[in-house]
Structure formats: structure tokens, C-alpha cells
């Protein structure tokens, strides 16, 4: 894996952990506090009183044991409905909340006893607050028994009616680990009923949204959660800034190094032109090149034929006093004495060929040619 990919994976994992920590704190059942809600009592003060706990967010709803523990810590118990009038009263409480779909736990639960032939399944259900009331509001085909031990009050406004009529506010046995809303009841007598905690069951709760809470409290809570999320995100991003800068600098350095390496590997487009010894004959009719061309032709002819006797090839130097009309400046092949003025020796007796460079005439050059046996071929001023 490349270092850049690994760094991105680590940053993503840290960011996800920080966001999860910012969304909510994991609570146990003992952390749930219902004292912020106002109980509803008959006539305002008469006992028993009730609290209808409804969660707008379905992920915050509680299972049966969690709901029972929350009511107990608030000084109550899961509701026991002892008469039809009390059933109607609780239905009105729920209707005033205008909640959406979501069943409510009530304090009815089946005892963990083996069912005998003489004992019906529904006779095994009892109230968790110790009430001995035999009032029941089961739906037509309930209870179904089996693995469904705890009891809920149906609240599914969007559900169509079943074979036994509407489901609304009817009772149904359900699995105790299901997440639902619940109703607490506060009576004059508060019998100490030991709570049965579900063994080996992990509880993850968040602070519930009670129906009695005002919009201002909700806004404050939302603002607090948003601020905590922003702080957690800042704590994650600020330490990661040096790593991001290091990654950017490393990327830029690698890019510059690769560009320079590619530039060095590319061939140089400029090529040097190779000049031939002899200039091109099509360069023009410059008077300065006529002497050069004549010597070249004479050299080629001289090399092509066999010469039994070598002789010096000279040309007459045009005098500066002669005019163009009476000076032909023709080239003559003749053997002369090197000491004579007006001639420049081009070829020595020992070389046997004509070279392609012309010295300017001077007595010093004449003496050098006589001693070395040949004349160096360079053209001055060309």
C-alpha cells in the first residue's frame, strides 16, 4: 500500500470515530432520568399520576427491562391498567401527544413458569407493580405466548384494521428485547418490587425526548450536541494539519524531481551543422570565391593526371597600380624563382600536389616555403 493511501485510511478512521463519539454518549439504564417531565394526574393532583414517554427517534426507544428501570428510578412503575376507565384515560393521554407509529410498554409480563394442561397461557400474566387486577384488553388472537413474554399497547395509526378490527390501543405480547415507548404510573402505594434485570444484556441508551419538554429545551440540546460535534471535529483536524502539509510537500518535491529527470533524459534538439571543406558552388558569384574555385579545379585536374616532373605552380599577383582594363589577372602555370617579386609559390617541388589555402605574399613566407619544402594552405581574411 502506498504511504499516501495508508495516511488517508488512518485519517478517515479517526474522523469516523470522532463523529460517532460526538453524536451521543452511551448510557446505562441507571443514567436515564425522567424527572424533567411533569406527570399528569387526575384533577391535577389526584393519584395515580402518569407519564407517557414517547421517543420521536426510534433508535432511542427502550426494551422492557430498560423501561421498567427508568420508571422505578423516577419513583414509579410501568403502568398497570386495572379498569376500562383507566384504559380510556390513558388512550386520551396518548391521543393528545399526536405521536406517530410506535407501541407502548405496559407493566404486564408472563411469569416464567411451565404451562400445565390446566393453566391457560393468559393466566400466567401478572403486573410488575404487584397489582392483582384481572382487567385485560387483548387483541382477538392474543396472547400468542411462545417466546413473546412482555406486553405492549398497540399504537399503529397507519396500520389497516386486522381480522379482529383496529389494532389501536389493544394489547399484544411481544419479545422483551424489542424497542418501544413506555408509560409510567405513580400511585399512592409504592410497593418495593424487585426488578428483574436481563442477564448478560448490554444496554445502550441516550437521553430520551420527553413530551413535556418545550421547544426551547430541544433547541438548547440540539445546539449543545452540534457544538460538541464541532469541537470533536476540530480536535481531530487540527493535529492532522501537519501530516497533510507533509504529504503536500512530499508530493511537490517528488513531482519536481520527476520533471527534472525527464528533462535531462530528453535529447538536445539543437544539432550542429557539419560544414564541408569546399563551399557550395551555388553560394553566389562573389569575386572573392573565383580564386578559390579556380584553385580547386586546378587541384582536382592535377591530382587526376600523372606527372613525371613536378614543378611549382604560381600565379601572378596583380599590381595595385594596374587598372582593371589592362590587367587580366589570369592565372599562369610557370616555374619561377621564389625570390622574384610578383609571384607566390603554391606548391613545392617535394609535395607534388596543390593545396587549397592561399597565403598573402610576403618575403618571409617565401623563405619559409623554400626551407620546409611545402606551403601551408590557409586563407587569411576569408
Swiss-Prot record:
Any GO CC annotation of this UniProt entry: ruffle
Stored Pfam families: Lectin_C
An example molecular function term from Gene Ontology annotations: hyaluronic acid binding
Residue spans, topological domain Extracellular: 22-235
Region (3 X 5 AA repeats of E-S-G-X-V), start-end ranges: 340-375
Compartments it resides in: Membrane
Region annotated Interaction with TLN1, chain positions: 337-382
UniProt region (Interaction with NF2), positions on chain: 330-374
Carbohydrate-modified residues: 117
Signal peptide (from-to): 1-21
PTM sites of type Phosphoserine: 286, 299
Keyword terms: Disulfide bond, Glycoprotein, Lectin, Membrane, Phosphoprotein, Repeat, Signal, Transmembrane, Transmembrane helix
Keyword Transferase: no
Region annotated Disordered, chain positions: 266-285
Cytoplasmic side of membrane: 257-382
Transmembrane segments: 236-256
Disulphides: 71-184, 150-176
Subunit structure: Interacts with NF2, RDX and TLN1.
Domain notes: The C-terminal domain interacts with the N-terminal domain of RDX.
Cited function: Receptor for hyaluronate.
PANTHER family to which the protein is assigned, alphabetical: CHONDROLECTIN, CHONDROLECTIN VARIANT CHODLFDELTAE
Name under which the protein is recorded: Layilin
Originating organism: Homo sapiens
Gene: LAYN
Amino acid at each position: 500500500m502506498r504511504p499516501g493511501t495508508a495516511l488517508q485510511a488512518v485519517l478517515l478512521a479517526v474522523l469516523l470515530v470522532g463523529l460517532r463519539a460526538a453524536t451521543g454518549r452511551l448510557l446505562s439504564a441507571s443514567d436515564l432520568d425522567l424527572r424533567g417531565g411533569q406527570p399528569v394526574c387526575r384533577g391535577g393532583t389526584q393519584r395515580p399520576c402518569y407519564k407517557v414517554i414517547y421517543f420521536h427517534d426510534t433508535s432511542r426507544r427502550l426494551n422492557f427491562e430498560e423501561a421498567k428501570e427508568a420508571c422505578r428510578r423516577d419513583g414509579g412503575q410501568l403502568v398497570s391498567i386495572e379498569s376500562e376507565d383507566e384504559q380510556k384515560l390513558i388512550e386520551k393521554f396518548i391521543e393528545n401527544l399526536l405521536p406517530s407509529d410506535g407501541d407502548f410498554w405496559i407493566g404486564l409480563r408472563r411469569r416464567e413458569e411451565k404451562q400445565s394442561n390446566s393453566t391457560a397461557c393468559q393466566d400466567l400474566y401478572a403486573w410488575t407493580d404487584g397489582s392483582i387486577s384481572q382487567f385485560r384488553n387483548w387483541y382477538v388472537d392474543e396472547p400468542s405466548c411462545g417466546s413473546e413474554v412482555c406486553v405492549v399497547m398497540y399504537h399503529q395509526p397507519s396500520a389497516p384494521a386486522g381480522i379482529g378490527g383496529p389494532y389501536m390501543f389493544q394489547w399484544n405480547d411481544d419479545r422483551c428485547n424489542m424497542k418501544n415507548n413506555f408509560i409510567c404510573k405513580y400511585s399512592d402505594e409504592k410497593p418495593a418490587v424487585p426488578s428483574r434485570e436481563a442477564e448478560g444484556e448490554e444496554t445502550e441508551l441516550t437521553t430520551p425526548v420527553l413530551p413535556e419538554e418545550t421547544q426551547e429545551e430541544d433547541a438548547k440540546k440540539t445546539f449543545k450536541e452540534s457544538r460538541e460535534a464541532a469541537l470533536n471535529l476540530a480536535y481531530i483536524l487540527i493535529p492532522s494539519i501537519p501530516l497533510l502539509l507533509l504529504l503536500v510537500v512530499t508530493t511537490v518535491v517528488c513531482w519536481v524531481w520527476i520533471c527534472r529527470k525527464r528533462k535531462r533524459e530528453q535529447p538536445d534538439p539543437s544539432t550542429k551543422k557539419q560544414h564541408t571543406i569546399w563551399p557550395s558552388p551555388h553560394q553566389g558569384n562573389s569575386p572573392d570565391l573565383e580564386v578559390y574555385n579556380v584553385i580547386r579545379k586546378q587541384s582536382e585536374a592535377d591530382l587526376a593526371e600523372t606527372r613525371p616532373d613536378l614543378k611549382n605552380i604560381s600565379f601572378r599577383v596583380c599590381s595595385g597600380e594596374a587598372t582593371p582594363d589592362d590587367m587580366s589577372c589570369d592565372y599562369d602555370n610557370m616555374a619561377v624563382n621564389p625570390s622574384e617579386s610578383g609571384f607566390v609559390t603554391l606548391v613545392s617541388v617535394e609535395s607534388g600536389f596543390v593545396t587549397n589555402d592561399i597565403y598573402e605574399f610576403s618575403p618571409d613566407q617565401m623563405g619559409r616555403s623554400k626551407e620546409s619544402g611545402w606551403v601551408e594552405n590557409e586563407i587569411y581574411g576569408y
